[in-house]
Amino acid sequence: MSLIDIQNLTIKNTSEKSLIKGIDLKIYNQQINALIGESGAGKSLIAKALLEYLPFDLTCTYDSYQFDGENVSRLSQYYGHTIGYIYQNYAESFNDHTKLGKQLTAIYRKHYKSCKEEALSKIDKALSWVNLQSKDILNKYSFQLSGGQLERVYIASVLMLKPKLIIADEPVASLDALNGNQVMDLLQHIVLEHGQTLFIITHNLSHVLKYCQYIYVLKEGQIIERGNINHFKYEHLHPYTERLIKYRTQLKRDYYD
């Protein structure tokens, strides 16, 4: 069963050039779904379209869009407590003039009615998931942390809300191998043990082959291959997909990807 089902998704720029070309996409419930492809293929555009985060100079159309079996009219009502978004510009999520403990508490209490002590308990638990301790984080400002630490705080801020769906755009790209693998293990755990759903965009094909159950391959704005993990491990693949998996490249991203 799919949690998100969008049909004939098309994204165009101001010159009417199609950047995403009429794709059908399902994000399967309680699975790790992946979208792979080279830089410039349009992967991040798809994530932003699903979240209604596209830049103003791009237009998005589709024939139908359902979330959890219901037609989507205003997706913003689901943000935070139902849909979490992990994206690369994590530093933008925190300001520099308020301590992180106060910011994280405000985020939690925005979505859940709770006292400060309960919020701090949930924050402490989420920070421990990403190998951080509250005593090292909550009394600091964002600029006092390294990029890797701040990214893990950001991931914790999404996970603490326990959203039904997490859309993650290169969630561990800025982390070292040890912490990156730990975060991926955590994301796999919340899907397998807690029934959450993950849609991940990544260039790390080793992670895709290790963690994901369903995979989409995007090339020049079109989905050229899709299937479960067994299809990608054991069946004949599109030549483009074979090339991606063979080299397992970590490619730089351009503005729209």
Curated annotation (Swiss-Prot):
InterPro entries: AAA+_ATPase, ABC_Ni/Peptide_Import, ABC_transporter-like_ATP-bd, P-loop_NTPase. Residues 4-245 form the ABC transporter domain. Part of the ABC transporter complex NikABCDE (Opp2) involved in nickel import. Probably responsible for energy coupling to the transport system. This is Nickel import system ATP-binding protein NikD. The gene is nikD. PANTHER family: NICKEL ABC TRANSPORTER, ATP-BINDING PROTEIN, OLIGOPEPTIDE TRANSPORT ATP-BINDING PROTEIN APPD. It is found in: Cell membrane. It is an enzyme of class 7 (translocase). Pfam families: ABC_tran. Belongs to the ABC transporter superfamily. One of its GO terms (molecular function) is ATP binding. Its EC number is 7.2.2.11. The lineage of its organism: Bacteria, Bacillati, Bacillota, Bacilli, Bacillales. GO terms for cellular component: plasma membrane. Keywords: ATP-binding, Cell membrane, Ion transport, Membrane, Nickel, Nickel transport, Nucleotide-binding, Translocase, Transport. Disulfide bonds: none annotated.
